């Protein structure tokens, strides 16, 4: 009986929180919140993208500390955890998973000396995150990861760029283009 009351009380708190949040949204924001939750994300399958011109080194500074030294154990937001093959494991907080999907390690301090690890992270991400599935395919994660990948790719000779990486990069850019965040404007 007491458990039922607590469940009902928690549900009422969530309802009032939702109501209080929704009342400040514009109609367009509300529409796109519902639209993006109902609509299934898709990624258009494309042919292999072609490189146009030579890539040059990215001139930006590296200021972040690496979050991983082995590609298996990561520290984000003060929480260290060992990652298996599941980049979307529900036991990790969503913000922690977002940080994992950003792949900031590709451009962290000393990353130029960790090429094998960077390649492993990209290959592992592609293998564990099919197109349009999971946290990594949400717009904010996509936008940050795309920038990190491009910056990292710019440090490689074009013959070292794997075909799978370019296809994934193209799919991610396409997916981001299809998920404009009207619901937060």
At which residue positions do the language-model features occur?
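Extreme N-terminal leader/anchor segments
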Residues: 11-83
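Pocket-edge structural micro-motifs
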Residues: 78, 89-91, 107
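Repeat-mediated protein-protein interaction surfaces in helical alpha-solenoids
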Residues: 83-89
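Aromatic-lined, polymer-binding surfaces characteristic
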Residues: 94-185
